[in-house]
């Protein structure tokens, strides 16, 4: 049956259902965006955070993503390579109950290390897959 052949009430019901579904998706994304913004603000209140020769200097949100920028401390010998530090940091974040909850709610994390010694940039994304979170 084509749309032209559908009775008026069925078509209206179908359109209302689709509109409701799309509104639900938009509402979920809006909520996730607000959560990401709040999470970035909470992290920012505690900056800078130093660990193993690296410093977390910036946290900001972009849509449903919390973007965090870490720099290697100039003139300081780091105890880990940037990749090793990111792997360790990823493990810690994925184990954190608050981060797990945020990821379950649709928040993703993007972590960037700017290595001031080499000028290289290293990046990791944290989401359901990278943290091994099964969708409920």
From Swiss-Prot:
Lipid-conjugated positions (S-diacylglycerol cysteine): 25
Transmembrane feature ranges: none
Family of the protein in this entry: Belongs to the GspS/AspS pilotin family.
GO CC list: cell outer membrane
Keyword Membrane part of the UniProt annotation: yes
Induction, as annotated: By heat shock (shift from 30 to 45 degrees Celsius) (at protein level).
Pfam families for this protein: T2SSS_2
Misc remark: In many other E.coli strains this gene is part of a type II secretion system, but in MG1655 the locus is missing a number of genes.
UniProt entry keywords in alphabetical sequence: Cell outer membrane, Lipoprotein, Membrane, Palmitate, Signal, Stress response
Lipidation (N-palmitoyl cysteine): 25
Subcellular location: Cell outer membrane
Name of the featured protein: Lipoprotein YghG
InterPro entries registered for this protein in UniProt: T2SSS_2 (IPR016502)
Functional description taken from the UniProt entry: Involved in a type II secretion system (T2SS, formerly general secretion pathway, GSP) for the export of folded proteins across the outer membrane. In a functional T2SS this subunit helps assemble the outer membrane channel.
Topology in the lipid bilayer: Lipid-anchor
GO biological process, one term: DNA damage response
Residues annotated as signal peptide: 1-24
